[in-house]
Amino acid sequence: MGFLQGKKILITGMISERSIAYGIAKACREQGAELAFTYVVDKLEERVRKMAAELDSELVFRCDVASDDEINQVFADLGKHWDGLDGLVHSIGFAPKEALSGDFLDSISREAFNTAHEISAYSLPALAKAARPMMRGRNSAIVALSYLGAVRAIPNYNVMGMAKASLEAGIRFTAACLGKEGIRCNGISAGPIKTLAASGIADFGKLLGHVAAHNPLRRNVTIEEVGNTAAFLLSDLSSGITGEITYVDGGYSINALSTEG
């Protein structure tokens, strides 16, 4: 029996089999969890439903996190199928493509800043607020996906780094707020992975190569490795952990200097 047997988990942000969210979903299902999913636009519904079916789920709901009405509707609909919620995965991030290349100050705009923060950062407390009644008193857990650009200046990551910094603050505040209700909240800072979302960052291939050459493991991490970490953080095995950011990056974040060898 898997360590997530009987757990009910809602996963956001799964848009392809290369998505980190897919790696998380697969790991959770392998450990016995029941899953539900969201999609953001109608053209993705069929694709997400197909992947959900492969993971033994028929629970797929539309949710544009820029809309409080859609967020609230997801949990209203989910409540018709489940009596509660044990896990929530926030795998959501977006910034206009033109803001993810070149000079930071030249690329940033008020509109790009607001969009990146609304979708990538505000969406975590917005989802947690709506999920709270279903998660309360169940030893439940929230996991959100971040990146090293939250705390380091990564070329071309630009405004998304600011949004991820805000997300990580949101993880800590959410953990502090919900702990007394038996709800934990943690983050995973994953190393760069070639996903559809990552393709919007300029020179991403160079970033992948640099990280693989300079982290202690001398390779990039996989969605399976991130998925296994998320499954642990969503389980009772991690019951004493909340408000933390766990790095799954092959050790790249420990480096003071990037040297060959």
Swiss-Prot record:
One of the GO BP terms on file: fatty acid elongation
Active site: Y147 (proton acceptor), Y157 (proton acceptor)
UniProt pathway annotation: Lipid metabolism; fatty acid biosynthesis
Catalyses which reaction(s): a 2,3-saturated acyl-[ACP] + NAD(+) = a (2E)-enoyl-[ACP] + NADH + H(+)
An example Gene Ontology molecular-function term: enoyl-[acyl-carrier-protein] reductase (NADH) activity
Pfam families documented for this protein: adh_short_C2
EC class: oxidoreductase
SUPFAM superfamilies in the record: NAD(P)-binding Rossmann-fold domains (SSF51735)
EC number from the UniProt entry: 1.3.1.9
Site (Involved in acyl-ACP binding): K206
Keywords, comma-separated and alphabetical: Fatty acid biosynthesis, Fatty acid metabolism, Lipid biosynthesis, Lipid metabolism, NAD, Oxidoreductase
Binding site for NAD(+): G13, S19, I20, D64, V65, I92, K164, I193, K194, T195, L196, A197
Superkingdom to which the source organism belongs: Bacteria
Positions annotated to bind substrate: A95
Additional observations: Present in outer membrane vesicle formulations which are used as vaccines in human.
NCBIfam families to which the protein is assigned, alphabetical: PRK08690.1
Quaternary structure and partners: Homotetramer.
Summary of the function given for this chain in its UniProt record: Catalyzes the reduction of a carbon-carbon double bond in an enoyl moiety that is covalently linked to an acyl carrier protein (ACP). Involved in the elongation cycle of fatty acid which are used in the lipid metabolism.
Family as reported in the entry's similarity comment: Belongs to the short-chain dehydrogenases/reductases (SDR) family. FabI subfamily.
Name recorded for this polypeptide: Enoyl-[acyl-carrier-protein] reductase [NADH] FabI
Natural source organism: Neisseria meningitidis serogroup B (strain ATCC BAA-335 / MC58)
